[in-house]
A protein has these predicted regions:
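Short amphipathic alpha-helical segments, especially helix-boundary/capping motifs
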Residues: 5-10, 40-45, 69-72, 106-110, ...
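Hydrophobic transmembrane alpha-helix bundles
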Residues: 43-44, 78-90, 113-131, 147-156, ...
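General structural feature for long, well-ordered alpha-helical segments within catalytic domains
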Residues: 26-30, 61, 65, 90, ...
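Catalytic alpha/beta core domains of metabolic enzymes, predominantly
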Residues: 139-140, 144-272
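C-terminal alpha-helical cap/extension of soluble enzyme domains
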Residues: 9-15, 37-42, 221, 234-323
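Active-site beta->alpha loop and helix N-cap motifs at the rims of alpha/beta catalytic domains
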Residues: 2-161, 298-299, 319-323
Length: 323
């Protein structure tokens, strides 16, 4: 189970067609891109993550996306499925659908909806808000879990992520949790590294924002990833990681700085209200998906974002051929 967690999971975006439906053929093509030999050996798929707009998909659409991901992966790389519904019962049904489709594990995020559960949730004081739901899902399907702890009221200590003591409790009480996504602010991430390393069992630290991979690698805490950055910068990201793994810091820094990877990531992550849209814009500009449309009420791309990303992709050697 530890090896299952220590992979570079990509939070795959969901392409939509002109009518606003999930573009299944485009999704299959994107899956085949991720199945290229170099990534297949080390990577994994998260179908229906937050980046895949799971909050705005119907139950049948979620089923179809997972079914396609499992079909295309064909056992060559692991597939985890996002789970979301406004009710715990609905989340259990979603998890059962994913298990029936043959996924290797689940990608769980905190409850959403009421102000009680979202902006006002004190996760340190009331860990059961999420823990009870995780337990219900775990009891129903008994699959490995990657946690996406983006929930509750943001704090200066942790940023967007569920606080460290709550994370520790969840990991101790639910042995099926094998990986924890690092959705925290910089200081919070450093605290979480220590907390997760102090657990009685191995649990993978999964880097999220591509803009911090350099620090994760320097501290030797990049066990794996759960990141949407793979949607737009797979090749130089692998080069950068490989350089660090080979202890070639000079090469890693050259890829990161002179190679333009840092600047590309920094723009993508500079505005979290545009984050998942920018994943799609960049993937579209690279020719990996047919457009950058999101399902309303998600935002629409602005001309300046497109031009900035076009320039940054070119600077990172990722421009589409002919541009």
């Amino acid at each position: 189970m530890t090896e299952l967690a220590r992979r570079y999971y990509t939070a795959v975006v969901a392409p939509f067609d002109d009518a606003g439906r999930v573009d299944e053929e485009a999704y299959r093509r994107l899956m085949r891109y991720f199945l290229q030999e170099r990534f297949r050996r080390v990577g994994g798929i998260i179908a229906n993550p937050e980046a895949g707009e799971i909050y705005y998909l119907t139950r049948e659409e979620k089923r179809r996306v997972v079914k396609i991901a499992v079909e295309e992966a064909g056992g060559k790389m692991p597939v985890f499925a996002g789970v979301f519904d406004l009710t715990t019962e609905g989340c259990v049904e979603c998890a059962r659908d994913a298990k029936a489709a043959g996924v290797d594990g689940l990608f769980l995020m905190p409850p959403a909806g009421s102000i009680d559960l979202v902006t006002m949730w004190n996760a340190a004081q009331y860990p059961e808000y999420w823990l009870d739901q995780i337990r219900a899902i775990d009891a129903a399907v008994n699959l490995p879990i990657i946690a996406h702890p983006a929930g509750g009221s943001p704090t200066a200590q942790w940023g967007l992520g569920v606080p460290g003591e709550t994370a520790r409790m969840i990991c101790r009480e639910v042995p099926n949790v094998i990986g924890w996504k690092m959705i925290y602010n910089y200081d919070g991430q450093r605290k979480m590294w220590k907390i997760l390393r102090s657990l009685e069992r191995p649990l993978a630290i999964l880097a999220a924002g591509g803009g911090l991979f350099h620090e994760f690698l320097a501290h030797d805490v990049l066990d794996g990833t759960a990141s949407g950055s793979w949607n737009y910068a797979l090749e130089p990201m692998l080069d950068h990681i490989d350089a660090w793994r080979a202890n070639d810091v000079v090469k890693a820094r050259r890829i990161w700085v002179e190679g333009g990877l840092r600047d590309l990531h920094e723009f993508i992550y500079s505005d979290y209200s545009r984050l998942h849209l920018r994943y799609k814009i960049a993937a579209w500009l690279r020719g990996l998906i047919p457009n950058c449309k999101m399902r309303p009420p998600m935002p629409v791309a602005k001309a300046e974002e497109i031009e900035t990303l076009r320039r940054l992709l070119k600077g990172a050697g990722l421009a589409r051929e002919g541009e």
